Amino acid sequence: MQFVSVDAWGKKAEYIRNGLNFNYMMDNVDEFLDRIPVRNSVTFIITYNNLSVTSLDKLLEGILELRKRHSKTYQRVWFDIPLLRQPAWQQITLLPESYQAIHEANIEYMRENSGEEKGLHIFKDFEIQKMLRNLAYWRKNANASTQNKKNFYAFFNEHDRRRLTNFETVFPEM
């Protein structure tokens, strides 16, 4: 089993994980699954944070596509979605309540692509339950603290200065 740590899709993933070439990584995942067709799998570890929310839909679609392409006799593509707890200013709980609708739409997409009758090319019940658990935590612990917002702003301003990146270009919706 190989583990792939990625928290978003495309340029957003590259921003979060400085130095990542997202397309190269996905090509390598595909090649690994092609070249070693038996007794292996890939697990995506998605550390769910406030920068993950707006592109998780594309990442879920990518995971489902990999399942369709590579899971013929057993599940070869997995994912886990633990919540980021620290730093507090990067938790999903800092986001406005309106972002929960994005998360809910992802849960609905997963439900539409679940069900044992569809074989291996589905989202499992326990994966949907993890997403529901994350939503429940978010609702219970929503915390738009002014200090956390200041820390978020300060961190990513410094991040952009040091790494020559641009938060507003990569995350215009935020």
Regions found by a protein language model. Give the residues of each.
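Radical SAM/AdoMet-radical enzyme domain recognition
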Residues: 1-84
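Flexible glycine/acidic-rich beta-alpha junction loops that bind and position SAM and/or redox cofactors
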Residues: 48-54, 72-105, 116-119, 124-135
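Radical SAM enzyme core and accessory elements
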Residues: 104, 111-174
